[in-house]
Regions:
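Sec-dependent signal peptide recognition
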Residues: 2-9
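Charge-biased low-complexity segments
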Residues: 18-229
Length: 229
């Protein structure tokens, strides 16, 4: 017997929590059920009892299309799960984010949990990347902040194009959807120039966001986003 419940962080489109009538985070509850991740994502053929959580990112277009979806691999065992998510994301659609009354392209960080036990399979979805401080404060099912991707972000022109680099940017995100005090942690490759780092800080501070939500309320949170080439 195969059971595949789909657990949404947002109960329904009508019940989606917002700080105002003109703001809504992107969510998986797309009206056409055959285009949802829950319909398209297939559980990989794996033997035995398993529990795997994949941390993923995607650019959610204003039309709900998922673009550039990728997941972090901890080891080779994660590969079939990463491939399954990538395959489903190519066809899936999401309800796009709404900021200031307009649908906007956003950077989404989410997790997918695959559980197989006693021949039963479940796939759970979390609209947050699982940062410890936010999970401790708001639980596993909070909806993390989502950053609007601008057309001409400063870092695109200021940062290296060829030499590989990657870093994390950590900032405070208020319930009003404003980011403050970004700090940068270098993670791999070359260390970008200060011009690049300042451009990234400028991008974070000047961007629009949907705030983090917990129990239907906009709340302050830690916002962390990876940057790389």
């Amino acid at each position: 017997m195969i059971r595949r419940p789909y657990l949404l962080l947002l109960a329904s489109l009508a019940a989606t929590p917002t700080p105002g009538q003109d703001t809504r985070p992107a969510n998986f509850d797309y009206p056409e059920t055959d285009r949802r991740m829950e319909t398209l994502l297939e559980f990989p053929e794996i033997k035995g009892d398993i529990s795997v959580v994949m941390s993923c990112v995607s650019r959610i277009k204003a039309n709900g299309r998922m673009d550039g979806t990728g997941c972090y691999m901890q080891n080779n065992y994660d590969q079939p799960f990463m491939q399954a998510i990538g395959k489903a994301a190519k066809k899936a659609r999401m309800n796009p984010a709404i900021v200031a009354g307009k649908t906007r392209e956003i950077f989404l960080q989410f997790r997918v949990e695959f559980i197989q036990k006693d021949e039963q399979q479940t796939i759970d979805y979390y609209l947050n990347p699982g940062w410890e401080e936010n999970v401790k404060a708001y639980g596993f099912r909070h909806v993390a902040g989502q950053r609007v991707i601008g057309r001409n972000e400063p870092w695109n022109a200021a940062c290296p194009k060829r030499a590989k680099w990657s870093l994390w940017v950590r900032s405070y995100l208020g319930p009003d959807g404003r980011a403050e005090s970004p700090t940068i942690q270098h993670t791999n490759g070359i260390m970008p120039t200060e011009t690049c780092l300042n451009a990234i800080r400028q991008t974070i501070v000047n961007s629009f966001y949907t705030p983090t939500f917990a129990d239907g309320e906009a709340v302050p949170s830690t916002f962390i986003e990876p940057f790389s080439n």
